[in-house]
């Protein structure tokens, strides 16, 4: 009998790590705003400077979130890959790290279309032409695809039941959580102040399909960790993160 334990845990992980990554990203904006005396106000997926600042101050605040996300994501992935044994903790850290890395590289993808987003504001301040931002977006897409294919090796440790069913496992590891993230995070993001705030929640999860595609082509996968029960810790963590996220609205 097929179980959905891996799928449910993966969905809980993706939702909770998406929220944690978003709050940390926005908190970096907030802290930068405080240091720049902009009297910022923290919300679930945006920060408002209540004090009118200079263009440079606004750009510095805008850049703080993506920069923090990249550094944080790389650190989490390094720790997970080097020191954490296969477990739900490792799977959690893998999703958290990859999602955080998208906090910069993913924003480069949408910069040509989101002029009011973090990278869009920075590009505008630096006077970067639209065609250059498109070139940067394409380069970012290629780099993300390379990294995410490389990190597919971090998903080979898990299976849904004693007898490894790769087709079912890859659905539970990737397909269910990717689409769940797109739908649930979009729903949790309302109300929105600008349409641009929905772009990351709708389009960035699609980058994980490169990880899925690489995993799908892998041969000789022999996972030894069966995940067929839902973690109560993940349930509580996901509920708490959703409460905090909605409180910040």
Which sequence ranges carry the predicted segments?
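Membrane-interface helix caps and helix-loop-helix hairpins in membrane proteins
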Residues: 58-59, 187-195
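N-terminal membrane topogenic signal
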Residues: 1-13, 169-172
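Hydrophobic core segments of alpha-helical transmembrane domains in multi-pass membrane proteins
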Residues: 195-207
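Small-residue-rich helix-interface/hinge motifs
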Residues: 5, 13-63, 67
């Amino acid at each position: 009998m097929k179980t959905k334990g891996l799928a449910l845990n993966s969905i809980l992980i993706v939702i909770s790590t998406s929220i944690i990554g978003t709050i940390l990203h926005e908190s970096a904006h907030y802290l930068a705003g405080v240091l720049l005396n902009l009297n910022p106000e923290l919300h679930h997926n945006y920060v408002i400077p209540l004090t009118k600042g200079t263009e440079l101050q606004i750009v510095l605040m805008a850049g703080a979130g993506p920069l923090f996300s990249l550094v944080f994501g790389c650190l989490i992935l390094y720790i997970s890959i080097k020191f954490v044994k296969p477990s739900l903790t490792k799977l959690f850290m893998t999703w958290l790290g990859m999602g955080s890395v998208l906090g910069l590289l993913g924003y480069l993808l949408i910069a040509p279309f989101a002029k009011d987003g973090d990278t869009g504001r920075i590009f505008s301040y630096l006077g970067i032409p639209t065609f250059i931002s498109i070139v940067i977006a394409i380069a970012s897409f290629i780099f993300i695809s390379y990294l995410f294919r490389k990190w597919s090796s971090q998903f080979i440790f898990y299976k849904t039941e004693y007898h490894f069913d790769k087709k079912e496992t890859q659905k539970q590891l990737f397909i269910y959580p990717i689409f769940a993230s797109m739908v649930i995070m979009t729903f949790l993001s309302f109300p929105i102040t600008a349409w641009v705030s929905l772009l990351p929640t709708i389009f960035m999860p699609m980058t994980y399909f490169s990880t899925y595609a690489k995993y799908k082509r892998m041969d000789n996968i022999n996972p030894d960790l069966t995940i067929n029960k839902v973690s109560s810790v993940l349930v509580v963590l996901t509920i708490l993160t959703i409460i905090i996220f909605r409180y910040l609205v």
